[in-house]
Regions:
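Conserved short alpha-helical segments that host acidic/polar catalytic motifs at enzyme active sites
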Residues: 1-251, 260-296, 335, 430, ...
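Glycine-rich oxoanion-binding loops at beta->alpha junctions
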Residues: 68, 72-85, 276-289, 313-349, ...
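Acidic/histidine-rich
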Residues: 154-188, 460, 465-491, 528, ...
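Active-site phosphate/pyrophosphate-binding segments
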Residues: 261-265, 269-299, 379, 389-518, ...
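Glycine-rich phosphate-binding loops that contact phosphosugars or nucleotide phosphates
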Residues: 293-442, 524-565, 586, 594
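Generic C-terminus detector
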Residues: 545, 558-560, 570-611
């Protein structure tokens, strides 16, 4: 979850370090720090602060660290609470070495005991601090050789940048299971844990892979593997618009990203439907009927919002392709001894492509012999590189912690995948396929239409925004969307929200329904519509306040609810792409009503890179 930046060049490092860390705020953090080497004083100056980056900027405002080489870090506490001492960068006993690190050093306790016995004095509770002390131990005049000795001692997942006072023009970085990128400039080079940190400075990058070690100077980058053998890297040209990481006139990134969904969905669909709507085109996969028919089962593995997308994906693949699907929470999958064979397909879903539990589950599935595929939004991410095949969602950068456009584009890819498999298996009639894909083409315009009328949702948020509890109900696909709506509300407004399959009300949930409790009820699935109405009547009979979500043309729901939010009519398989929109907006405006930090909700991070 941490953010890492590094700079070496002819310019003052501090300015870039703060700028780069600001671009990584979406990753979540509780403290920040920078270390800059000053050639005149021949010293590494470290400055840290708990809280937002603004606190660090305020601290150094009147005395900015001077120097042309430095490293910076935003920390999300894992070992030791948020404090100045636990913040990065960390140094050794002499102050000659500084290190920033993202991830976990699993064997740090044993290393720490060893170092303490050797006379080293530790200042923090972190696992990271063993790194500069190990570097101090092994340094004998050769910075790179010392780093390699350190790397041979540590176990875990990490991205690390090392800095040495004795090597004032050199940073050394490496990674294992955590992202790291090098930006290539003119007379300067940059290091970051994610591309947004450097995009304003350069579009030419090296994506660092696991086990690679990069020696970064202002005019050169030398990359080798752990054995010291040179690696030739291809320059990756970033084609993002630099303005894509800005709010674009919206009050919050989340609201901007909600309104970017028509474009994000359109981009994700682009080139993936035949011109006559007869078939799905996924050139990334190039599957054959024989290959798809070999699947005895599909696993979908993800966390959080991506898990909810996976639940909808299960419905799509089973309904269209008629292949059994099991959906797993990534953090549970690898510990339950799943039954996997070489005729199993494992699909992992992650917006960032760096979710550590999902990455670990992917590796476990591969170890067990499964074919693997990733659905992710970030080209060159760890999950994208680890999976056998990748289908990208073209959502563009998503900055707000609460995922919106990543979710809808994940649903698009899941539907495309189900239809693609169905086409190869012959499980959907041609006329039905054309009908579905034709309606899918209309979804971006229907999303725009849905997002136009937000005033009723604002009113609901203001009216019910201070309730302690909110319940969401639905059946079939409506239930899966209800789960996502509940998550959105709780994560950014801090309201206790729960989603239930409407048919489960009598099995316990009904005991919680009392006068005035808001209940959001989705009723768009025709096959279970009457049963859903019956469940809505049950909560209404307990004096709940019911907000219904229905397709335009529904003339029944308003009779049993206090309010109804309508979305455009489409096929019931596709309607989750529309019904989730008012739930996203309801969460946003409720959080706004309650004065919450919409883009950076407490205790949460955008990219979860520790288990």
């Amino acid at each position: 979850m941490c953010g890492i930046v590094g700079y070496v060049g002819d310019k003052q490092a501090a300015r870039f370090l703060i700028e780069g860390l600001t671009k990584l705020e979406y990753r979540g953090y509780d403290s920040a720090g920078i270390a800059v080497y000053n050639g005149e004083s021949d010293a590494i100056r470290v400055e840290k602060s708990v809280g937002r980056l603004a606190e660090l900027e305020k601290k150094i405002d009147s005395n900015v660290p001077v120097g042309c080489m430095g490293i910076g870090h935003t920390r999300w506490a894992t070992h030791g609470g948020p404090s100045d001492l636990n913040s990065h960068p960390h140094t050794d006993c002499t102050g000659d070495f500084a290190v920033v690190h993202n991830g976990i050093i699993e064997n740090y306790l044993a290393l720490k005991e060893e170092l303490i016995e050797a006379g080293h004095v530790f200042k923090s509770e972190t696992d990271t601090e063993v790194l500069p002390h190990l570097l101090e131990t092994y340094y004998e005049g050769d910075f790179e050789a010392a780093v390699r000795k350190v790397l041979r001692r540590i176990e875990g997942s990490y991205s690390i940048v090392f800095m040495s006072k004795a090597d004032p023009d050199t940073l050394i970085c490496t990674k294992q299971d955590n992202p790291l990128v090098i930006g290539l400039g003119e007379g300067e080079n940059f290091i970051a844990s994610d591309i947004p940190a450097i995009i304003a400075r350069t579009r030419r990058t090296y994506i660092i892979n696991d086990g690679e070690v990069a020696v970064v100077k202002k005019d050169s980058v030398w990359i080798t593997n752990r054995r010291g053998e040179p690696i030739t890297k291809k320059v990756f040209e970033v084609n993002w618009n630099a303005e894509a990481a800005e709010k674009g006139g919206y009050e919050h990134f989340m609201l901007k990203e909600i309104h970017e969904q028509p474009k994000a969905v359109r981009d994700t669909l682009s080139g993936r439907i035949a011109k006559d709507d007869s078939a799905v085109i996924l050139d990334e996969l190039k599957w054959t009927a024989e290959y798809v028919n070999s699947f005895s089962k599909v696993f979908i593995i993800a966390c959080g919002t991506a898990y909810h997308a996976g639940l909808v994906g299960k419905y799509y693949i089973e309904n269209l392709a008629r292949v059994p699907v099991e959906v797993d929470i990534a953090s549970e999958f690898r510990y339950r001894k799943p039954i996997i064979a070489d005729n199993t397909l494992t699909i992992v879903v992650s917006q960032s492509g760096e979710t550590i539990d999902t990455l670990a589950a992917l590796k476990e599935a591969k170890r067990l012999g499964s074919k693997t595929m990733a659905v992710t939004n970030v080209v060159g991410s760890s999950i994208a590189r680890e999976a056998d095949q990748v289908v990208y969602t073209w959502a563009g950068p998503e900055i707000a912690v609460a995922s919106t456009k990543a979710y809808t584009t994940q649903l698009i890819v899941m539907f495309l995948l189900g239809a693609y498999m169905a086409g190869l298996r012959g499980t959907v009639e041609d006329s039905r396929m054309k009908e579905l894909l034709g309606k899918l083409r209309n979804i971006p315009a229907q999303i725009s239409e849905t997002l136009e009328d937000v005033d009723p949702i604002k009113a609901f948020a203001q009216q019910y925004g201070y309730n302690d509890d909110v319940f969401f109900l639905g059946r079939a696909l409506d239930y899966h969307v209800a789960l996502e709506g509940s998550l959105k509300l709780k994560e950014i407004s801090y309201i206790h929200a729960e989603a239930y399959a409407a048919g489960e009300l009598k099995h316990g949930t009904l005991a919680l329904i009392t006068r005035g409790i808001p209940v959001v009820a989705l009723a768009t699935q025709k096959s279970v519509y009457e049963k859903t109405l019956s469940n809505i009547k049950e909560v209404k009979a307990r004096d709940a306040v019911v907000i219904g979500v229905a397709a335009k043309g529904d003339t029944e729901l308003h009779k049993y609810t206090d309010h109804v939010i309508f979305v455009p009519e489409t096929d019931e398989l596709l309607i989750p792409l529309l019904t989730v929109l008012p739930l996203q907006l309801l969460a946003y405006y409720t959080a706004l009503t309650r004065g919450c930090d919409v883009d950076k909700p407490r205790n949460l991070a955008k990219s979860v890179t520790v288990e």
